Curated annotation (Swiss-Prot):
NCBIfam families given in the database record: atpA, PRK13343.1
Record's keyword terms, sorted: ATP synthesis, ATP-binding, Cell inner membrane, Cell membrane, CF(1), Hydrogen ion transport, Ion transport, Membrane, Nucleotide-binding, Translocase, Transport
Protein residues bound to ATP: 170-177
Protein name: ATP synthase subunit alpha
Family statement drawn from the similarity comment of this UniProt entry: Belongs to the ATPase alpha/beta chains family.
Bilayer topology term: Peripheral membrane protein
Subunit structure: F-type ATPases have 2 components, CF(1) - the catalytic core - and CF(0) - the membrane proton channel. CF(1) has five subunits: alpha(3), beta(3), gamma(1), delta(1), epsilon(1). CF(0) has three main subunits: a(1), b(2) and c(9-12). The alpha and beta chains form an alternating ring which encloses part of the gamma chain. CF(1) is attached to CF(0) by a central stalk formed by the gamma and epsilon chains, while a peripheral stalk is formed by the delta and b chains.
Domain of life: Bacteria
Class of the enzyme per the UniProt entry, highest EC level: translocase
A GO cellular-component term linked to this record: plasma membrane
Role, per record: Produces ATP from ADP in the presence of a proton gradient across the membrane. The alpha chain is a regulatory subunit.
SUPFAM superfamilies: C-terminal domain of alpha and beta subunits of F1 ATP synthase, N-terminal domain of alpha and beta subunits of F1 ATP synthase, P-loop containing nucleoside triphosphate hydrolases
Residues with site note (Required for activity): 371
């Protein structure tokens, strides 16, 4: 076999050309101890707080405790594959998540990875840091646009505006999630109108819930056709505590994408009590000193930095908004516990749900006396403001009188009238689950109650009367609904036409 020296030389020269002297430098450390989802790592001297690190088995973690001797890392996922002496690599990146419209209709985990079996996200999807500072004072503006929930009792008495943070608080099994899901479903008609300025994209964050519950919510939204403008971020009960702690921030970052690009988004945190418990678990395992109820000292900051990111931006900054509906579960109606009081003080109002009302059949079980919106009528259309103005006062007087009426039987006519009106209004505010109403339908319904047109209608017939008057307006007087929807006002001639329609129905209804 002949060897041609020139060929050998050519090959060698090519090999030398390809040879590079660039070595890949990575900062690595070693696992000192691991257990309960926490790893103590030695050697990562330049690691940043909140930085992602990678273990030799491919699992990820986040550096939270930066101490002089070692670094405390919380592990995302199973820690059983990690053992003492394993190599830990810095990734150089702070925890981030995919953002954008590609996530609509998807279910993702606490890190933004799809878990719905519909395939991976597009590689070109934008990514954004999970922990960012909330907008300052100058970029914000006052809340002025309504965020319609489709529930009469909320839209008329505790209105929520775009860019507001309204807490939903109550014991277990009082319908907190149902209120939030109704708010998502109600956006369908608004989003179908095609007006990009009115569209509201929704993000539902499930923290520490059963997988079956999350699946049920996904199914409900799909059946209502609401998944096409919704993203579900799920850190279920079987997920590691760091993922449950991180999921709300991940969801918030996804919502901020819409807010910062001049669009509107709604985010629901279900629920923040479980996030606080997950954070307490992490903090205690990281040997951080406990405070009240064994929560760490910065548990207030945990929620305040999250909820402050919900805002209505000024027109110079695009005029986008992020509305937050955090949910808190109380124990035995105790709203003076640590986490409930914290979140009440951070938010712009709260919707109280009570077990007692729920069991009486008043659903949604909203305690109108204790519920408040600190934005108030600024977040209502003129028509709703006009018809529901006196409603809160009438219901407050009714509750006061109802308490005294139990003791006395001989009541004067005005008291009897007040009690009658109050019971009719309470009945009117009941609403079936997953059947939200448009603003125009709500205005007609509340108008009937407040103006006294239901005073002589039997209590059991109120729901039927309400559905009939709305049906009659839709079929015979659609201009009433159109006028309220287009102008947001209840004009004099529209009101007169509505009164005539009500009187016409009452003639046939009572006979």
């Amino acid at each position: 076999m002949d060897i041609n020296p020139s060929e050998v030389t050519k090959i060698l020269k090519e090999q030398i050309k390809k040879f590079g002297d660039k070595a890949e430098v990575t900062e690595v450390g070693q696992v000192l101890s691991v257990g309960d989802g926490i790893a103590r790592v030695y050697g990562l001297d330049n690691v940043q707080a909140g930085e992602m690190v990678e273990f030799s088995d491919g699992s990820k973690g986040m550096a939270l405790n930066l101490e002089s001797e070692n670094v405390g890392v919380v592990i995302f996922g199973d820690d059983r594959k990690i053992k003492e002496g394993d190599v830990v690599k810095r990734t150089g990146s702070i925890v981030d998540t995919p953002v954008g419209k590609e996530l609509l209709g998807r279910v993702v985990d606490g890190l933004g990875n799809p878990i719905d079996g519909k395939g991976a996200l597009d590689k070109a999807t934008k990514r954004s840091r999970v922990e960012v500072k909330a907008p300052g004072i100058i970029p914000r503006q006052s809340v002025s646009e309504p965020m319609q929930t489709g529930l009469k009792s909320i839209d008329s008495l505790v209105p929520v505006g775009r860019g507001q943070r309204e807490l939903i608080i109550g014991d277990r099994q009082t319908g907190k999630t149902a209120v939030a899901i109704d708010a998502i479903i109600n956006q369908k008609k608004i989003n179908e109108s095609g007006d990009e300025k009115q569209k509201l994209y929704c993000i539902y964050v499930a923290i520490g819930q059963k997988r079956s519950t999350v699946r049920q919510i996904q199914k409900t939204l799909e059946e209502a056709g609401a998944m096409e403008y919704t993203t579900i971020v799920a850190a279920t009960a079987s997920d590691a505590a760091p993922l449950q702690f991180l999921a709300p921030y991940t969801g918030c970052t996804m919502g901020e994408y819409y807010r910062d690009n001049g669009m509107h988004a709604l985010i629901i945190y279900d629920d923040l009590s479980k996030q606080a418990v997950a954070y307490r678990q992490m903090s205690l395992l990281l040997r951080r000193p406990p405070g009240r109820e064994a929560y760490p000292g910065d548990v207030f900051y945990l929620h305040s930095r999250l909820l402050e990111r919900a805002a209505k931006l000024s027109d110079e900054h695009g005029g986008g908004s992020l509305t937050a509906l955090p949910i808190i579960e109380t124990q035995g109606g105790d709203v003076s516990a640590f986490i409930p009081t914290n979140v009440i003080s951070i938010t712009d109002g709260q919707i109280f749900l009570e077990t007692e009302l729920f069991n009486q059949g008043i659903r949604p079980a909203i305690n109108v006396g204790l519920s408040v919106s600190r934005v108030g009528s600024a977040a209502q259309t003129k028509a709703m403001k006009k018809v529901s103005g006196s409603m809160k006062l009438e219901l407050a007087q009714y509750r006061e009188m109802a308490a005294f009426a139990q003791f006395g039987s001989d009541l004067d006519a005005s008291t009897q009238k007040l009690l009658n009106r109050g019971s009719k209004l309470t009945e009117l505010l009941k609403q079936k689950q997953y059947s939200p109403m448009t603003v125009a339908e709500q205005v007609i319904s509340v108008f009937c109650g407040v103006k006294g047109y239901l005073d002589d209608v039997e209590l059991k017939d109120i729901a039927e009367f309400e559905s009939k008057i709305i049906e009659k307006c839709k079929s015979e007087k659609p201009e009433i609904l159109e006028s309220v929807l287009s102008s947001g006002k209840l004009e004099e001639d529209t009101e007169k036409s509505l009164v005539d329609t009500i009187m016409e129905l009452k003639k046939n209804f009572n006979s």
